[in-house]
Amino acid sequence: ENQLALIGVKPEDIKTVVLSHMHLDHAGNIHLFKHANVYVPKADFMFGQTQVHLNPDPATHGGYVKADLDVPVKQYILVDEDFELAPGIEVVNLPGHTPGLIGLIVHLEKDGTIILPQDCVYTQEVYGPPAKASGLLYDSIEFFKSIEKLRKLQKKYNAKIVFAHDYEFFKTLKTVPEYYE
């Protein structure tokens, strides 16, 4: 809420949310957007539901939190294929870290194309080349296929990739009040 407030936006102003996957560090605070349409990867949503509802021990849930998965939102839209979300915004499937994971490709007039792969690839070091398996991986084969897909998309669009967990890389990004156009 505090970050949105810095740009004059309230959670209720947001009508569409895209969750890359349902791990706690991405789905946390989804309760602030109960009024929104929430896009989530179908395979990950179903896997997370299974994890939290079939085993009562949270220590075995692997990054999924029951409270996040049970939030009643306006509508969950389960994604299982690539598509255009809005003009200039594409949703792409990048599984591996989790059974399903989605990223965004954002085409900007001034700053060009930016790819937000989220936990498909944590850092520049993991991206390589060569790509390196790291962190939590549900399916290592799908992980490496997703990295190759990212490389093709990066080349196709001459895109900049924003790594979701690369703290050194974060220092190079614009922050509020600056923004990308």
Where are these regions (language model features)?
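Active-site metal-binding motif and surrounding structural segment of the metallo-beta-lactamase
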Residues: E1-V40
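Metallo-beta-lactamase
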Residues: Q3-V9, D13, K42-N93, I141-N158
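Hydrophobic/aromatic beta-strand patches that form the interior of the parallel beta-sheet core
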Residues: V18, Y39, I77-V79, V92, ...
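Active-site glycine- and acidic-residue-rich loops that bind
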Residues: L19, E90-L104
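Active-site metal-binding loops of divalent metal-dependent hydrolases
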Residues: M22, A43-D44, H97-T98, Q118-C120, ...
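A short secondary-structure junction signal
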Residues: N29, Q49-V52, I102-I105
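Short polar/acidic secondary-structure junctions
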Residues: L32, F83, P95-G96, H107-E109
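Cap/insert and terminal regions of metallo-dependent hydrolase folds
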Residues: G103-E181
